[in-house]
């Protein structure tokens, strides 16, 4: 909708359903259409915790999906739409505009430093001490070669995180 940056307060107001027109946040006179995720979504839980400061997201059941590809398609094809996906879905030309939060762009660098507020760690667990094969797999997953490939795909790697908590 032509809006390049929102304050966190504006983002919260949009996703909780209080702000419903882009003109109220510096955009055109156009209805805001939320493209949301179901309550069971881990991405939604992360977004609510870190982007919405724990506020409950206003669901739009007609545009609700747990499929990031479908979500992007819905945002691209719907006037006034806004949604959220993992940064990895925005590599290359995803056909959508990103929105900064408090003038901080959603980039890997800003995630690594903790400047961009919406991120979380993924975890791997073993039952007890890992056996030799499992240890080799974990070493590979946490290694530089694999990390470089993951970054090319738009995923961050824990070894580059300087921020340790929100």
Pin down the residues of each PLM region.
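Exported/periplasmic ABC-transporter solute-binding proteins
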Residues: 1-166
């Amino acid at each position: 909708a032509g809006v390049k940056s929102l304050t966190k307060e504006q983002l919260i107001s949009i996703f909780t359903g209080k702000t419903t027109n882009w003109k109220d946040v510096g955009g055109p006179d156009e209805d805001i259409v939320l493209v949301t995720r179901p309550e069971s979504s881990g991405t939604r839980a992360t977004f609510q915790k870190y982007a919405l400061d724990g506020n409950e997201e206003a669901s739009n059941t007609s545009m609700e999906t747990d499929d990031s590809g479908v979500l992007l398609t819905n945002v691209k094809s719907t006037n006034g739409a806004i949604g959220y996906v993992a940064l990895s879905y925005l590599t290359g030309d995803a056909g959508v505009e990103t929105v900064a939060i408090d003038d901080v762009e959603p980039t890997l660098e800003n995630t690594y430093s903790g400047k961009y507020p919406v991120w979380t760690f993924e975890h791997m667990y073993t039952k007890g001490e890992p056996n030799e094969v499992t240890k080799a797999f974990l070493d590979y997953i946490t290694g530089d070669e694999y990390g470089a490939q993951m970054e090319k795909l738009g995923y961050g790697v824990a070894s580059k995180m300087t921020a340790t908590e929100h």
